């Protein structure tokens, strides 16, 4: 369950958060100037799109700008063709909305178009809705061309601002590694529960973001190729150091303060060097017999391992051409066998069309946000959908409250575009601070911005129409209700179904750690383990948001939470071993592989059989005997035994659908 300071942590300052929020605010203010100066329609939507077009680094933002302009160009061309066919036929217009929506949402669930297909479905369906309400064909064409301008204008402003102010991907990678080293140094100076939580959050972030930034830096041809390779190695080394600090910090600070001071100095100097673009190849920790004699054997082993990692901190490996991975197909392997993909497309389309028919029959177009809400909040499982419903509801109410207050007390006093830009800047800064935070609350920031802009940007002149905010809020509330009922009553999919499959995956990842050769490869596997653990923790939290009818019982969730703690401990301990401990690694790998097979046979495979009988012809191989429990070292034996005992206690998780079947 989230700890008491969960929300406070999500809102507290983090490196780069304020800078990103300020850039979002500046782009919103400049976009507002242009739409008010040239009186283009839908100024609120133009400003709102800024939040979708920008990311913390320059490289990703520029790619998004180009991709969105190309995408909207292609979509408008397709919609113009479709509009010519269905504009005068309401029945065919509704049918085309349903067919296109179902098809695109199926692709959003079952294909490589997953990141954008749902957005395309929303744009196409809503555009066909607007086509039906237009009084003449020429108005349709002009409206669609203005829609292109609504995307191109903020994209152009974003491109200019990001090209000047946004940090390059290479700089983002440098800062991330330097901040990790600063965190390690601070943990050694002030070990405690707060620092342990910070370290755990940093470990869960893994190296994926750094790897992405370095890849973008390669595409940009920014920085020296040797520096990029050094930074890639430094990312792995700093991750291993972070995991080792969990064990090392309490022992070294109590037993050898001078050595701790020297290590902190070394780490801070390395952080400064990396920030200025001079990643060190090696860091020398002065270890002698006197220093090692002053600590316990456990701490001595950790210090020797630490010194080994520091000595190879940023040594760039020789350039090798990596093997090309096997090309993945366009569709997921279970695209046409798993009914959940079809159910998701049908449920989302049905909810959206119910809202469309409702506000059309009521002749109340102001609540069209209910139609949009169904596409935005609908996700693969009930837990994810309920979380997004809550974020949209909170953001909508908060943004509408801020916007209404501005309409009552601030907008009557505004006398220039510059004053309106200042108001937009402040509102966007508040929303941007939330949007620039954790993904657990970022979407709420988007909704705060949307509701606020709908209130304060109503056209080419100041307006005080409170019915706009009222109708949009009513639409969102109604859309939330329809989506909630649809996803909790019609083919509900509990996120609990994914938990055991992910647990099996992380057990396989853990079993692979001892088998790989080379510390670098083992560090990479450890980062994958922590990334999967972070996903599992999120799924366990989301499962508690689901309705009681499909929620997994608490008695099934608690042992799985204990299992995550054991896996986390064991993954950190495996990093202590190097290739010199080959026998211990082999034994640990065999034990873990056997445990993963047994967990698959007892817990995961029975669930897979009941959910998809055609795939149940061949189960996991359980013919192998349990490996002999030979000693693998003090840090491995204990967690391995705890892991085995906890796995033995687990039974297939019962969610709503399995309880109903029983």
Functional labels for PLM-detected ranges:
Residues 1-156, 160-165, 279-448, 458-481, ...:
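Alpha-helical transmembrane segments and their membrane-interface boundaries
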Residues 1-25, 37, 58, 138-139, ...:
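Long, hydrophobic alpha-helical segments that serve as membrane-spanning/inserting helices
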């Amino acid at each position: 369950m989230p700890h008491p300071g969960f929300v406070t942590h999500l809102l507290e300052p983090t490196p780069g958060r304020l800078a990103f929020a300020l850039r979002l605010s500046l782009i919103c203010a400049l976009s507002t100037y242009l739409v008010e100066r040239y009186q283009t329609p839908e100024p609120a939507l133009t400003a709102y799109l800024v939040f979708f077009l920008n990311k913390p680094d320059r490289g990703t933002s520029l790619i998004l700008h180009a991709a969105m302009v190309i995408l909207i160009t292609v979509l408008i061309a397709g919609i113009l063709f479709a509009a010519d066919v269905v504009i005068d036929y309401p029945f065919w217009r509704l049918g085309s909305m349903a067919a296109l929506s179902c098809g695109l949402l199926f692709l959003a669930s079952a294909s490589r178009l997953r990141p954008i297909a749902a957005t395309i479905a929303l744009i196409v369906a809503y555009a066909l809705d607007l086509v039906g309400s237009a009084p003449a064909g020429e108005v349709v064409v002009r409206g669609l061309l203005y829609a292109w301008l609504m995307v191109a204008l903020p994209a152009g402003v974003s491109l200019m601002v990001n090209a000047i102010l946004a940090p390059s991907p290479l700089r983002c990678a440098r800062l991330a590694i330097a901040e990790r080293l600063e965190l390690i140094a601070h943990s050694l100076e002030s070990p405690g529960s707060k620092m342990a939580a910070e370290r755990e959050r940093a470990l869960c972030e893994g190296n994926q973001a750094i790897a992405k930034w370095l890849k973008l830096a390669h595409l940009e041809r920014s920085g020296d190729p040797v520096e990029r390779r050094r930074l890639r190695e430094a990312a792995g080394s700093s991750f291993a150091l972070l995991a080792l600090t969990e064990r090392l910090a309490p022992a070294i600070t109590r037993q050898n303060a001078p050595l701790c001071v020297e290590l902190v100095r070394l780490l801070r100097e390395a952080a400064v060097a990396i920030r200025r673009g001079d990643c060190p190849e090696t860091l020398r920790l002065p270890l002698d017999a006197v220093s090692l004699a002053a600590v316990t054997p456990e701490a001595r082993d950790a210090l020797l391992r630490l010194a080994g990692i520091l000595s190879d901190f940023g040594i760039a490996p020789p350039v090798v051409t990596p093997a090309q991975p096997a090309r993945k197909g366009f569709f997921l392997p279970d695209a046409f066998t798993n009914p959940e993909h079809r159910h998701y497309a049908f449920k989302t389309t049905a909810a959206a069309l119910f809202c469309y028919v409702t506000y059309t029959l009521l002749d109340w177009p102001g609540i069209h946000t209910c139609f949009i809400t169904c596409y935005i909040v609908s996700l693969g499982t009930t837990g994810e959908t309920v979380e997004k419903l809550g974020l949209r509801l909170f953001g909508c109410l908060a943004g509408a409250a801020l916007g209404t207050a501005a309409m009552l007390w601030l907008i009557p006093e505004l006398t220039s575009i510059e004053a309106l830009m200042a108001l937009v800047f402040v509102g966007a800064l508040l929303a941007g601070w939330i949007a620039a935070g954790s993904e657990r609350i970022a979407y709420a920031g988007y909704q705060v911005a949307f509701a606020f802009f709908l209130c304060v940007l109503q056209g080419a002149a100041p307006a005080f129409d409170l019915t706009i905010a009222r109708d949009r809020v009513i639409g969102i509330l109604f859309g939330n209700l329809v989506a909630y009922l649809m996803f909790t009553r019609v083919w509900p999919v509990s996120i609990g179904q994914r938990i055991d499959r992910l647990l099996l995956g992380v057990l396989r990842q853990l079993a692979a750690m001892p088998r790989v050769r080379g510390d670098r490869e083992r560090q990479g596997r450890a980062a994958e383990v922590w990334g999967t653990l972070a996903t599992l923790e999120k799924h366990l939290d989301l499962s508690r948001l689901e309705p009681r009818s499909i929620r997994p019982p608490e008695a099934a969730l608690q042992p799985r939470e204990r299992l995550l703690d054991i896996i986390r401990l064991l993954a950190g301990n495996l990093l202590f071993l190097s290739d010199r401990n080959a026998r211990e690694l082999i034994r640990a790998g065999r034990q873990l592989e056997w445990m993963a097979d047994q967990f698959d046979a007892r817990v995961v495979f029975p669930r897979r059989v009941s959910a998809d009988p055609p795939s149940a012809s061949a189960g996991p191989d359980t013919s192998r005997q349990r490996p002999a429990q030979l000693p693998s070292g003090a840090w491995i034996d204990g967690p391995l035994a705890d892991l085995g005992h906890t796995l033995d206690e687990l039974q297939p998780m019962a969610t709503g659908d399995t309880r109903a079947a029983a």
